[in-house]
Amino acid sequence: MDIGEILNLLPHRYPFLLVDRVVEIIPGQKLTAYKNVTINEPFFNGHFPGHPVMPGVLILEALAQATAILAYKSENMDPSRKLTYLMGVDGARFRKPVLPGDRLQLEIEVVRHKGAVWKTKGLATVDGARVAEGEFLATVVDKDADAAESAAS
């Protein structure tokens, strides 16, 4: 799956789109994707000057975006009518820094799926070395219902 299809699925845009390519997807089971990390990423200006390191929370966000792609493709959802929200992250661990020039591999595996709720395990690696991991809880909602709820509050 190339960047064009990813842009059709996810609402995220620069500088917050953190998935560049999906290389494997088994609907309802697992997904493998990549994020190419370059020195041009805006977060490197302040994290950390002179020693650029990708913020761990953005690695988790990349895994969450990959989870959303897996949910959309598993259920053949229309992304113009649906949104996926991250509900929680458990057991997040950061093992090694991610640096400019790294290719971040994102691996998502479905732990459980019931209705609109997805629980996944996410693993981020660089050159086969584990850099971050966690369990993700996400929900898929109707865009119209979400807009109506926001207007009512």
Curated annotation (Swiss-Prot):
The keyword Lipid biosynthesis applies. One of its GO terms (cellular component) is membrane. Pfam families: FabA (PF07977). It catalyses: a (3R)-hydroxyacyl-[ACP] = a (2E)-enoyl-[ACP] + H2O. GO terms for molecular function: (3R)-hydroxyacyl-[acyl-carrier-protein] dehydratase activity. The active site is at 47. GO terms for biological process: fatty acid biosynthetic process; lipid A biosynthetic process. It is an enzyme of class 4 (lyase). It is found in: Cytoplasm. Keywords: Cytoplasm, Lipid A biosynthesis, Lipid biosynthesis, Lipid metabolism, Lyase. InterPro entries: FabA_FabZ, FabZ, HotDog_dom_sf. Its main location: cytoplasm. SUPFAM superfamilies: Thioesterase/thiol ester dehydrase-isomerase. Its EC number is 4.2.1.59. Involved in unsaturated fatty acids biosynthesis. Catalyzes the dehydration of short chain beta-hydroxyacyl-ACPs and long chain saturated and unsaturated beta-hydroxyacyl-ACPs. Belongs to the thioester dehydratase family. FabZ subfamily. This is 3-hydroxyacyl-[acyl-carrier-protein] dehydratase FabZ.
